[in-house]
């Protein structure tokens, strides 16, 4: 947990949904494709100034963090999934705290179900406010998190052009119905087991990881980026120069074309011109 909080950095994108059915489709697509984003953005190959054996150490750390509140949420793909099922999941996520009168009250491991009944050991006789529920929603950390929006949580941090590329990727996939349907067609045949194997392989293998159905994640990334580009083009949002949003995907196109996650470039520099001195990263890559 401390490694996650103190040693990792992410870029996240929050996206709206228009209805329960829209939420379900977007949730499923974004969960299934989250490892593709992880591979495209993977850029955390160092720990304590040395290579750590991972393309995305940040993503790996999440595999060793409280399983009760992390992961790929296979129940999202079950028939009948909707708001109620996610509420049931959150009610079973152990609590961390209750915030009252400007202070945090330790409720670690206690049950929100008991809180609803006024039987929370940390606050006996009290029932939750809606703010307590909102706080509790923020204490689960799956690969995609549901609130009043969907939160994409798979990408490592990076330079400004990748910061702009992440929302372009997900907006392109999720905000045009044709693109969303195409993305769902791409992933709907993947089993829960295949999704988990993909998620587990990407932190260490990046774009070289095997993809469901054959080929590599790098090859799959080209198809995903094509769908996202079509979605952005269909949106037709343009700037003052008449350019649409597709250009924001170009950094990801270059990564996919190279077949190497950004971590590979960092490792090449570390082993080459940096001569094993990671402090040179600050001179070359600060922004």
Predicted features and spans:
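Loop-rich catalytic cores of soluble enzymes, especially ATP-dependent carboxylate-amine ligases
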Residues: 1-145
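Residue-level signal for alpha-helical context at structural boundaries
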Residues: 31, 44, 48, 55, ...
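A structural signal for alpha-helix termini and helix-coil/disorder junctions
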Residues: 36, 40-43, 143, 176, ...
């Amino acid at each position: 947990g401390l490694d996650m909080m103190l040693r990792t950095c992410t870029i996240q994108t929050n996206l709206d949904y228009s209805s329960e059915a829209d939420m379900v489709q977007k949730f499923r697509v974004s969960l299934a494709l989250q490892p593709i984003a992880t591979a495209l953005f993977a850029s955390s190959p160092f720990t304590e100034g040395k290579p750590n054996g991972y393309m995305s150490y940040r993503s790996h750390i999440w595999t060793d963090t409280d399983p009760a509140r992390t992961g790929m949420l296979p129940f999202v793909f079950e028939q009948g999934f909707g708001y109620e099922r996610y509420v049931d999941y959150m009610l079973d996520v152990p609590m961390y705290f209750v915030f009252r009168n400007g202070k945090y009250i330790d409720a670690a491991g206690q049950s929100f179900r008991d809180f609803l009944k006024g039987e929370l050991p940390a606050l006996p006789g009290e029932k939750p406010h809606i703010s307590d529920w909102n706080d509790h929603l923020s204490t689960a950390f799956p690969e995609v998190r549901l609130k009043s929006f969907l939160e994409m949580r798979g990408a490592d941090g990076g330079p400004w052009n990748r910061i702009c590329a992440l929302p372009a990727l997900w907006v392109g996939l999720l905000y045009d119905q044709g693109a969303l349907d195409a993305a769902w067609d791409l992933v709907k045949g993947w089993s829960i087991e295949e999704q988990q194997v993909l998620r587990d392989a990407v932190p260490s293998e990046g774009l070289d990881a095997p993809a469901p159905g054959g080929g590599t994640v790098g090859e799959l990334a080209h198809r995903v980026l094509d769908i996202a580009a079509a979605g952005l083009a269909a949106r037709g949002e343009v700037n003052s120069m008449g350019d649409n949003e597709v250009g924001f995907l170009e950094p990801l196109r270059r990564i996919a074309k190279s077949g190497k996650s950004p971590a590979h470039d960092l490792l090449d520099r570390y082993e080459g011109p940096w001569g094993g001195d990671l402090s040179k990263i600050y001179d070359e890559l600060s922004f």
